[in-house]
């Protein structure tokens, strides 16, 4: 059952070296943010091995199991990044740091991959052209807040659509896309 929804990492995702060292194994963990309704019957949850592997050749630490994106970030994903004050503050700081370091013009495109409810892009939207990409229906909240959002996974087809409709981005952000 696990193999249906995941893929074991047998070689480094950067160098292709098969010499991977296990740093820590935390057991089997279910995907986070799969909330059940209060009072509902507890059912067995699918779990995946949580092992951190290290490749000496590339120096990359990586998870030993790649879980299907539709399991980790389903359309019904319940979490909204705007809920957490510290995250709102961190994203505001990221915006301030970015505009100090990079000369961004009004028409430069900023894309956030895994944009969720548009929390990060809300900092950029008044002075810059923004676009969110997120697979969850929560992206509709961003659209209501005036943040153009593509509700889909970030993949080759999505990239082609973005390039055709919006052009190339000056800045691409991706936060909480390595959540598991």
Model features per residue range: what roles?
Residues 96-180:
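Conserved SAM-binding loop
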Residues 5-8, 38-40, 89, 95, ...:
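Sparse, context-dependent recognition of short Cys/His-centered cofactor- or disulfide-binding micro-motifs
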Residues 1-85:
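N-terminal juxtadomain amphipathic helix
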Residues 50-55, 59-127:
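Fe-S ferredoxin-like electron-transfer domains
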Residues 35-39, 76-78, 88, 135-136, ...:
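Surface-exposed beta-strand edges and their flanking turn/coil or helix-capping segments
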């Amino acid at each position: 059952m696990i193999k249906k929804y995941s893929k074991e990492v047998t070689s480094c995702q950067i160098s292709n070296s098969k010499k991977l060292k296990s740093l820590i194994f935390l057991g089997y963990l279910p995907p986070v943010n799969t909330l059940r309704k209060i009072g509902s019957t507890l059912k067995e949850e699918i779990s995946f091995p949580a092992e951190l592997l290290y490749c000496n050749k590339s120096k990359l630490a990586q998870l030993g199991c790649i879980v299907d994106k539709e399991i980790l970030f389903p359309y019904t994903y319940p979490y909204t990044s705007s809920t957490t004050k510290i995250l709102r503050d961190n994203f505001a700081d990221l915006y301030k740091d970015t505009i100090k370091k990079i000369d961004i013009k009004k028409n430069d495109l900023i894309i956030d991959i895994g944009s969720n409810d548009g929390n990060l892009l809300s900092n950029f939207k008044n002075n810059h052209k923004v676009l969110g990409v997120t697979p969850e229906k929560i992206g509709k909240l961003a659209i209501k807040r005036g943040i153009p959002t593509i509700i889909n996974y970030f993949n080759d087809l999505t990239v082609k659509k973005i390039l055709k409709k919006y052009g190339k981005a000056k800045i691409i952000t991706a936060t909480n896309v390595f959540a598991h």
